[in-house]
A protein has these predicted regions:
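Short active-site loop/helix that positions an aromatic residue
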Residues: 39-42, 106-117, 130-133, 273-280, ...
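Conserved "right-hand" nucleotidyltransferase catalytic core of DNA-directed polymerases
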Residues: 2-76, 120, 137, 147-372, ...
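Conserved pre-motif C helix in the palm subdomain of viral-like polymerases
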Residues: 188-195, 394, 546-566
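Acidic beta-strand-to-loop metal/phosphate-binding motif
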Residues: 32, 97-108, 390
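Active-site palm subdomain of RNA-directed nucleic acid polymerases
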Residues: 204-214, 560-583
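Nucleic-acid-processing active sites and adjacent nucleic-acid-binding tracks
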Residues: 65-100
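A common structural junction motif
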Residues: 482, 598-608
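Conserved beta-strand -> loop -> alpha-helix junction used to position metal-binding or nucleic-acid-contacting
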Residues: 118-135, 142-144, 426-430
Length: 624
């Protein structure tokens, strides 16, 4: 046994016994599976260990209608069945063509496949289903969902008592316990997963989520393969770059001290304020607390030398302290196997449906900084014999905005003209708007995205680097020349206020289930029952509906990107990474790149054609 010496522990006798047989499940249409593992990846905060070879499966729980069983084979505390027999049983079950149901399938399927056990048949993830059914939940744990949807609670008392008696963490070190104290718990996990799926099937149908559910279900195996393969990274080059950046940061800090006469903590607004005060320079304060406020946008737009030095020092500190340190921490044999969050979950994910990453978050790798962005991105390289291909949706969000504005009735004023303009693949939404309004493109982009995101005037003023009054004038000017953005925003807000939900192109629901008082001021959003009890039924309104347009655009962008990933994979192209509006692939040549570009171009039909721009290079940073 690979766990080393067997641990002998003494406990009161459990009610659970090992299964008497390896039950034939070939006639069942649905099988729920739950694994117990020794996970040295999770235990060392490196993400699930299956992709990096840290840990192993120690037990296999399975449930079908009317029967459940737990088959332990790697518990340090003993009570194991014959490992070869259990592994064969696992393999036989996973080879069946029926539907396999998991809670957090990326974890369990990842471990199975890393152990040489491919999972055949459709894969269902009840955690993904739960996030589609309600993206605003506090928790997506099996226990929390079972309580809310099944009125059942996991029986963990015996497990916790046994763990506490011997100083063992009941979750991270469950593999150390005798199997008899884990068996019932493991069986119940599989059984509850099966029961949840019966309930969620009905919810998906009732809420008309079948189309988007099928897309998410098909995407799951692709995400597992992406993490399994990982991203190649040049470790020695990363170490050298980190050393170089640390030296550059020290030089910048010396320059800041020379300019201001004092040492400045570049991340502490109060300390920066002292430097500005000493130099008799103005700076903004927060509206509520009147504390100094030095946002990155404000500093970037400030022309004073010290502001620019602080911007540079902050950037370089973040580059080496966040990005390069993460590369060193998470790389295994020259690859990074970041976790991909498909939807909302207890360990991350977005409410919009967009993919996110953790352990590490490669979506934070900088792109805009012209000096350091390419240097850090150049650390990531394709497989041997390939080029790195970066495929980017050009102006994905503005195109979505124009599509929806033109889709309401005969189209909001100005939207159809933009639809026509977008028939030219070189059309630039922000430049077109800038020309109409008579402002700079950067201002047009900031205002446009601010309106799409539901940004307030104060925040927009800081982003633009102007006063609140000047920002207000620019917004009025913008809305006069490009009225459809505000009209669409108001329409989305109204729909969210009235119905509490809006839907994306694929039918993904964006819900607004929290409530707040109608009284002016800042308030905590609450559940309907709590808000009614506190403020009265007639004095409450739905919260966060000003974000409705943003939710619609982000959700539709997620639909488009995910459908593209499916289409590309079906054509034989497995993505390396998905970063915001960008998909990265291993690409052989220009012909291969054109095939991917064509697949990505219009996976979902919109009034405005999608444009995918791509670049090829020896690394991510060189892909131009």
């Amino acid at each position: 046994m690979s766990n080393g010496l067997q641990l002998t522990l003494t406990f009161k006798k459990s009610m659970w016994n090992t299964p008497m047989e390896y039950k034939d499940l070939s006639q069942y249409k649905e099988i729920a599976i739950d694994l117990e593992t020794k996970d040295d990846g999770l235990n060392n905060k490196l993400g699930a260990g299956w992709a990096i070879g840290k840990g192993e499966i120690v037990g296999f729980a399975v449930a079908v209608e009317g029967w459940k069983g737990y088959f332990p084979f790697g518990h340090l505390g003993g009570g194991n069945m014959i490992p070869e027999q259990v592994k064969k049983y696992m393999k036989d079950i996973c080879a069946l063509p029926c539907t396999k149901i998991f809670h957090n399938a990326q974890y369990d399927v990842g471990w199975l496949e890393a152990s040489g056990i491919p999972v055949h048949g459709p894969i269902v993830d009840t955690m993904i289903a739960a996030a589609l059914i309600d993206e605003n939940r506090f928790s997506y744990s099996l226990n929390a969902l079972s309580v809310d949807y099944l009125n059942e609670i996991k029986a963990e008392t015996e497990l916790r008592e046994a763990a506490a008696a011997h100083g063992i963490d009941p979750k991270a070190e469950m593999w150390k316990l005798p199997a008899e104290h884990v068996g019932y718990y493991a069986e119940q996990d599989a059984e509850l997963t099966l029961k949840l799926w019966q309930r969620f099937k009905q919810e998906i149908a009732t809420q008309s989520l079948t189309t988007v559910w099928e897309m998410e279900q098909q995407l799951l195996p692709i995400l597992i393969k992406m993490r399994q393969r990982g991203v190649r990274v040049q470790v020695e080059k990363a170490e050298a770059l980190q050393k170089e950046m640390k030296n550059q940061e020290q030089e910048l800090l010396k320059a800041i001290k020379k300019e201001s006469g004092i040492e400045v903590d570049i991340w502490a607004s109060r300390q920066i304020a002292k430097a500005f005060d000493k130099m008799k320079l103005d700076y903004p304060r927060t509206e509520k607390t009147k504390e100094p406020s030095f946002t990155q946008n404000w500093l970037i737009n400030n022309k004073n030398k010290i502001a620019q030095l602080i911007v540079s020092a902050r950037e370089i500190n973040k580059f080496h302290g966040t990005f390069l340190s993460s590369i060193m921490k998470y790389q295994v044999n020259g690859r990074i196997h970041g976790e991909i969050n498909q939807l909302r979950g207890d360990n991350g994910g977005t409410v919009s449906g967009r993919l996110s990453m953790s352990n590490p978050n490669l979506q934070q790798v900088p792109a805009r900084n012209k000096d350091f962005g390419p240097k850090i991105r150049s650390l990531f390289i394709p497989e041997d014999g390939y080029k790195w291909g970066s495929f980017d949706y050009s102006q994905q969000e503005p195109r979505m905005t124009v599509h929806y504005a033109a889709s309401i009735g005969e189209g909001y004023e100005g939207s159809n003209e933009l639809v026509q303009a977008y028939q030219n693949s070189q059309a630039d939404f922000h430049q077109t708007v800038a020309d109409l309004v008579g402002i700079e493109r950067t201002q047009a982009k900031t205002i446009g995205l601010g309106l799409m995101y539901g940004m307030g005037k104060q925040k927009l003023a800081i982003s633009l680097g102007v006063s609140k009054d000047e920002a207000n004038e620019l917004i009025i000017k913008y809305n006069k020349k490009v009225p459809f953005v505000k009209k669409l925003s108001d329409r989305c807000k109204y729909a969210a206020d009235e119905k509490g939900v809006i839907r994306t192109k694929k039918g993904r629901k964006c819900r607004f289930d929290m409530w707040e008082t109608r009284d002016f001021g800042l308030h905590v959003a609450e559940k309907y029952e709590d808000a009614v009890a506190k403020y009265g039924k007639d004095n409450i309104k739905r919260a966060f509906t000003y974000k409705a347009l943003n939710r619609l655009i982000q959700g539709s962008s997620a639909d488009q990107t995910k459908q593209s990933m499916l289409d590309c994979y079906e054509d034989g192209h497995l993505p390396i990474l998905q970063i915001h509006d960008e998909l990265c692939f291993n690409v052989k040549d220009e012909k291969h790149a054109k095939q991917i570009q064509k697949k990505m171009q219009n996976p979902i039909e919109f009034k405005v054609p999608s444009v995918v721009e791509y670049g090829l290079g020896e690394s991510w940073g060189d892909a131009k």
